[in-house]
Structure formats: structure tokens, C-alpha cells
A protein has these predicted regions:
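C-terminal soluble interaction/assembly domains
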Residues: 90-198
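A small/polar active-site loop signature that marks catalytic segments
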Residues: 1-122
Length: 198
């Protein structure tokens, strides 16, 4: 259970400002405190799967852009930044842990293409992990993020082929009855085949 008074005391001890407890709608707009550059935060979130950071980034982006609720902000993002996704996107929070968030591999590949055109390749390889957790693969050609929930595994990112092409990919494996290591091994085989064939 969260102890709000303890959190308030810790914040008062740390922040050089007045700390007031309350819901956003009770407190008004407030003041955003400028924090560190976003790249180190994104890198931490991508490498350690920090779902709390993901949620906080979404909340802050919502506030900076002037949206009252997360629902209206997500609707805006779906109709603007992600309007070109090929499949319907069900997006209810930023944590990535909600059973209500639903996406497809095709959508993730399209989102990766959008990212590819928004930032440099050097930024991509800085943000995306270049390792599988089992470290059985030569990692220098795959930059990808894993996602794992019970009986669900995902791997989405970029692959550099032998010819130097950069491809976006996404695997989503669910409801499997074999050990997760077998899923990872088969994914690795497919990625190696694509790397070598193209």
C-alpha cells in the first residue's frame, strides 16, 4: 500500500519547492520541473523495462501538450503520430503492463519505421538494446526491445542484414506451451536466416 504522507515527506526533503498532495484535477495545472535530457531516461526505460518511467513520460507529455486527461491525449496521438498504423490500436495507459493495451506486430513495425525517420541511426542504436537476454547470438546486427508477460513474448526492433540493409521487425508469441527458451531459440534462427539471406 502507498503511504502518501511518507511520499510527501520524502519529496519535501528532496525538492526545493512546496509539496501538496492531491489529484491533478484538484491541484490545477501546477508547474513542471525541468528534468534531465530525455535520451538517458529513454535508454534506461528501454534497457531495464522501466514501466513506471514509461507511464511518467506519457503523463508529462500529456501535460506539456495541454491535454486534461490521458485518454484525450492517447486519442490525439492515435489520430496524429500513429494515424498511419495499419491495424486498430487499443492503448489505455503508458506502462505497457495493462491487459487492456492491445497491439499487433504490423503496428509495431510501422511505429519502428516512424522512429527510423524521426531520429538518426546512431540514436536508434543508443536507445535500443543490442543483446538477447541469453546472449547466444552475435548481437551487433540486432537492436531490439523485448517484452515479456506470462505466456507472451515479444521482440521488436531493427536488424542489419549482411548487405547492410536495415529492416524493422516484430515477433509476438503468445499462448505457447513450450519453454520460453525454445521461443527465443526459434526467433534467433529466423533473425539469423534473414540477416544471412538479405
Amino acid at each position: 500500500k502507498v503511504n502518501n504522507e511518507l511520499i510527501k515527506k520524502l519529496l519535501i526533503d528532496t525538492l526545493p519547492t512546496t509539496v501538496i498532495l492531491g489529484l491533478p484535477e484538484e491541484l490545477g495545472k501546477g508547474t513542471l520541473i525541468q528534468g534531465p535530457l530525455v535520451t538517458p531516461i529513454l535508454k534506461k526505460m528501454m534497457f531495464k523495462s522501466d514501466n513506471f518511467l514509461a507511464e511518467q513520460l506519457l503523463i508529462n507529455a500529456q501535460r506539456v501538450q495541454g491535454y486534461e486527461t490521458q485518454k484525450t491525449y492517447l486519442t490525439y496521438l492515435k489520430s496524429s503520430l500513429f494515424a498511419s498504423l495499419p491495424d486498430p490500436l487499443i492503448w489505455v495507459d503508458g506502462s505497457g503492463l495493462s491487459v487492456y493495451n492491445m497491439n499487433t506486430p504490423r503496428n509495431l513495425v510501422k511505429a519502428l519505421e516512424i522512429i527510423f525517420h524521426m531520429i538518426t541511426w546512431d540514436e536508434i542504436i543508443e536507445l535500443f538494446p543490442d543483446k538477447f537476454s541469453d546472449e547466444n547470438i552475435n548481437n551487433s546486427f540486432v537492436y531490439a526491445k523485448t517484452g515479456t508477460l506470462r505466456h507472451n513474448q515479444a521482440l521488436s526492433g531493427y536488424l542489419i542484414t549482411q548487405s547492410g540493409r536495415k529492416l524493422a521487425f516484430s515477433f509476438m508469441c503468445n499462448h505457447y506451451t513450450v519453454p520460453p527458451s525454445k521461443i527465443r531459440a526459434e526467433t534467433e534462427k529466423i533473425l539469423l536466416h534473414i540477416r544471412d539471406a538479405y
